[in-house]
From Swiss-Prot:
Localization of this protein: Nucleus; Cytoplasm, Perinuclear region
Family, similarity comment: Belongs to the EGR C2H2-type zinc-finger protein family.
Primary site of residence: nucleus
UniProt zinc finger (C2H2-type) residues: 374-398, 404-426, 432-454
Protein name listed in UniProt: Early growth response factor homolog 1
Organism, as annotated: Caenorhabditis elegans
Keyword Transcription recorded: yes
KO phenotype (gene knockout): RNAi-mediated knockdown causes abnormalities in oocyte development, including degrading oocytes in the proximal gonadal arm and ectopic developing oocytes in the distal arm. RNAi-mediated knockdown targeted to the soma, on an rrf-1 mutant background, exhibits only a slight increase in the frequency of oocyte defects.
Keyword DNA-binding among UniProt keywords: yes
GO molecular function: DNA-binding transcription factor activity, RNA polymerase II-specific; RNA polymerase II cis-regulatory region sequence-specific DNA binding; zinc ion binding
Tissue: Expressed in sheath cells and distal tip cells of the somatic gonad, as well as in the intestine and sperm (at protein level). Expression not observed in oocytes (at protein level).
Amino acid sequence: MALHEPPSKLNRHSHSNLLKPPSLNKPILTFADNDCLKTPTMNDMLKTPTVNSPRHTPMNIDGTPKVNGFSGFTPQTDQKFFGEHEPLFNQMHTTTLMPAPSSSYKEPAYSSEQPSSSSDEAKPKELLGSNSFGVPRMTNGNSKQKPEELTLKDIEISSTGPGGVDSPGLSAAMFQFSPMVEHFLQNLTNKAGLPELVVDSKTAGLNHQEPSDLIKSVQVRRSSIEDQKFSDVLHVPTLPRKTSEPSHLGSSLQNEHPQSNSRPSTVIPRVQRTNTSASLTRSMDHSSMSPISAHDDPYSNSASYSSLSTHTSFSDSASLAHFEPKTEPMDDYSYNFSDNDFNSFEFSSTSEELKNIGCQKMKSSKMPLQDRPYKCPRDGCDRRFSRSDELTRHIRIHTGQKPFQCRICMRAFSRSDHLTTHVRTHTGEKPFSCDICGRKFARSDERKRHTKVHKTSRSGS
């Protein structure tokens, strides 16, 4: 619109000429036809940019420079409204859908030319009214309109965006915001579908499994490893646990059965029980094949690997319960032994179990009964011990309990020192070394037996 030069001073008649038709030019109190006392109707709101603008009419002071089109509370001679000019209607329509960001900057040229406080109060209310109802403001031509291509682009973007995400039937294009807010909303509208695309492309590109599939695969892999460990334990045959009374134990030679589980509560000593009427000669024949040392073996003390048949007395030489030594220590500790070591190991001494069985009276004579106050509570077992921990280890032989389990191969042991020695077979630790030749061993009894080899070689030479 054309900018009209503000008159230098408005008199009473010229001011009323701008506001009312010529027929109503009379006193100054009737120049607005009492519009300030009327409640604005819908037609008034549609015809005027702001709803509350007629109230400011009597507060204007004569002599205040007024700009045509700025305080348009009444129709001006060069002002157009809805339907009167088609291009203006189209511009209003596009601006209502996506208002121009320059709406917040209004009348920069004449902001300093209005010293009146009433005119200053009219400006924010006009802004409020136009922002609330989306009615186009009549500018004086100084404020720049938003380019048409940008407006069309914004409308197109908002139409392609996910309409109805925040509120069904409403869109951000129906409201007017500041340029910064419009820029932020445009970024959100353009990137609305980006998260799903990023997740889908990442999943497709990296070929990741779902979290549930990963958990299932880990569980399957773990179960397969445990099955493999348990299957390795199955290679060592064991005896089924016997929970019957002692009179039902060991009447004939028991066959070894593989145990399906090697946990401490189910695994029993891997020994064979022979006939209880076996002779002492047969027992000593088996003792010559024993791979366990007599005194220095940590596996063989007064409580280890004793008889499981507790219905007979150890002092009775007529009925002896014999243990066939397990081959497991040979498998665990013999990988660095030579043939000479094996020969000397097999035939140099008898096991502690057989010595306790065959020489019970001699051992009892060595240690008085008062020095062995702990007696085995099992019926038929006359074993006595000087310490309570020895009795505890001895009772595990009757019950078959093995509370110490190897975490590598899941093998169980009845004593902690047995487990410690067994773990060295996995780690390769050899803390014991020969003082003569420097050879290292994992067990102290192995080193002692090796030292005897040096002594015999010196005595023979």
